[in-house]
């Protein structure tokens, strides 16, 4: 269930072993889930901005196996836009000092020293976690506005788990060390994902990887059904009966020994028949998600900025981040003298942004791009809108308990139902983590027993054999057969 990185990784590895697989993907046009590439008049749009970087050699090997020569190396450059100025990210002290000014920089240093001397013990929310590592003043400058745009909630209401997973290992000191010694630190230390200076990328966006995986799955006898969404999963004597529905309302039945689901937990649990106990369905329904849309703007290319993306820390505009698709890969832009920017807006399905007409969103994005100084009046020649439901699982103060309730119920009463990936496990991690959960699920299926607890895969796509603090390391994942 699901044709994103997790679902397709599982199908790819199983089909390669000769196992009969069927992939149900609700999108009628694109494979890749939130890692798809949307094409508009030849302009390629990466709807979420996907760097292909992993500490897991196994994941990297699989990427190279799937795509091979179309998997290119690209420089990483991103900056923060704050008070009409661009700040390098990772932090470069001279740049930050110049942009902030001596007085503001001194206040930031004092705030950082105070945080180190008097940290919040056992930080429970995002604001506390980040302030402990950067100081409250830098938190307010470089984290607060953007993060609250992403989640639509105050930083004090966001679980510290999200910060620990997304910016693990990063602090003001590590950023300064990176500026002086490079991403590996002064002694060749561990690379922090947030600080990498290059990454690999498919020539025409992440969807190119997953479309290639789909073709190979079908070559090995696997079946991919586009435009079919699972609506019921019923236990049978030998496994499960999965019912999918097409956009036209036609239903299809599939018999399965195992069901691997990367669908959002809330939807997945809602498909189960008979329904699980009330506490389980209640826990699933209590999980929430943040939705997302991107406005693609085709512009005259004036080389105003060459970042892969720019984080907008300006509360006067609604855009949260701007992607520069030509900087991801020149092959994503088909016309000389043109570029395509992706204006990212975070929202909830049905709210004002989400429900706006495409022409209104294109007008809003165009005005904000000019206001920010990243385009001139008359530079924007075309535009399009892509909406993505349930792009981000929300980490509120109850999410961990709710996920555990569902996980325990599935493990105890539904053998052979295997949640994987970001939404399938309600873990806001990158695609290498999603892929590793699928890889280990396949290992369990092929072994005929639970060799690995997939829930122990950490944010770095590493398998942790014993419970440890989220900042601890783990051994490399086992090689698949």
Question: In which residue ranges do the predicted regions lie?
Answer:
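N-terminal Rossmann-like FAD-binding beta1-loop-alpha1 element of flavoenzymes
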Residues: 1-23
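Active-site/ligand-binding neighborhood in enzyme catalytic cores
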Residues: 9, 96, 106-234, 239, ...
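Dinucleotide-binding Rossmann-like beta1-alpha1 core, especially the glycine-rich loop
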Residues: 41-118
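C-terminal segments that line or cap access tunnels to active or ligand-binding sites in enzymes
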Residues: 256-258, 262-436, 443-455, 466-469
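Conserved Rossmann-like nucleotide-cofactor binding loop
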Residues: 6, 29, 266
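Short phosphate-binding/catalytic loops that engage adenosine nucleotides
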Residues: 19, 222, 374
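Acidic, Ser/Thr-rich low-complexity intrinsically disordered segments
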Residues: 463-481
């Amino acid at each position: 269930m699901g044709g994103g990185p997790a679902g397709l990784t599982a199908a790819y590895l199983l089909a390669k072993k000769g196992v009969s697989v069927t992939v149900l993907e609700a999108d009628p046009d694109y494979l890749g889930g939130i890692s798809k590439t949307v094409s508009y008049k030849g302009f390629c749009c990466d709807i979420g901005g996907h760097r292909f970087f992993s500490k897991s050699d196994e994941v990297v090997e699989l990427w190279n196996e799937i795509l091979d020569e179309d998997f290119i190396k690209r420089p990483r450059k991103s900056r923060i836009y704050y008070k009409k100025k661009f700040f390098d990210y990772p932090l470069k002290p001279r740049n930050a000092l110049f942009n902030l000014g001596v007085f503001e920089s001194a206040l930031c240093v004092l705030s950082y020293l105070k945080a180190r001397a008097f940290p919040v013990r056992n930080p429970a929310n995002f604001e506390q976690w980040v302030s402990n590592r950067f100081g409250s003043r830098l938190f307010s400058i470089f984290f607060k506005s953007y993060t609250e745009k992403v989640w639509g909630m105050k930083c004090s209401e966001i679980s510290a788990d999200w910060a620990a997973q997304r910016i693990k290992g990063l602090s003001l000191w590590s950023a300064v060390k990176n500026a002086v010694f490079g991403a590996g630190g002064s002694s060749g230390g561990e690379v922090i994902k947030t600080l990498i200076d290059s990454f690999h990328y498919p020539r025409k966006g992440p969807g190119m990887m997953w479309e290639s995986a789909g073709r190979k799955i079908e070559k090995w006898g696997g079946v991919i059904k586009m435009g079919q969404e699972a609506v019921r999963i019923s236990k049978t004597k030998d496994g499960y009966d999965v019912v999918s529905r097409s956009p036209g309302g036609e239903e299809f039945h599939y018999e399965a020994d195992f069901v691997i689901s990367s669908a959002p937990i809330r939807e997945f649990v809602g498909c189960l028949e008979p329904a699980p106990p009330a506490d389980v369905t209640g826990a699933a329904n209590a999980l929430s998600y943040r939705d997302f849309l991107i406005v693609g703007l085709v512009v005259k290319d004036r080389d105003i900025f060459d970042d892969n993306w720019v984080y907008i820390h300006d509360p006067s505009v609604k855009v949260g981040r701007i992607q520069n698709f030509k900087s991801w890969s020149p092959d994503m832009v088909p016309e000389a003298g043109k570029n395509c920017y992706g204006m990212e807006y975070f929202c909830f399905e049905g709210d004002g942004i989400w429900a706006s007409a495409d022409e209104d969103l294109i007008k809003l994005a165009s005005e904000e791009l000019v206001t920010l100084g990243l385009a001139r009046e008359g530079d924007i020649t075309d535009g399009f809108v892509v909406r993505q439901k349930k792009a981000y699982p929300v980490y509120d103060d109850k999410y961990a308990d709710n996920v555990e309730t569902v996980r325990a119920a599935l493990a105890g009463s539904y053998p052979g139902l295997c949640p994987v990936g970001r939404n399938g496990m309600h873990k806001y991690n990158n695609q290498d983590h999603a892929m590793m959960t699928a890889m280990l699920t396949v290992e369990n299926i092929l072994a005929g027993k639970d060799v690995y607890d997939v829930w122990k895969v950490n944010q770095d796509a590493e398998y942790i054999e014993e419970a440890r603090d989220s900042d601890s390391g783990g051994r490399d994942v086992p090689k698949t057969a």
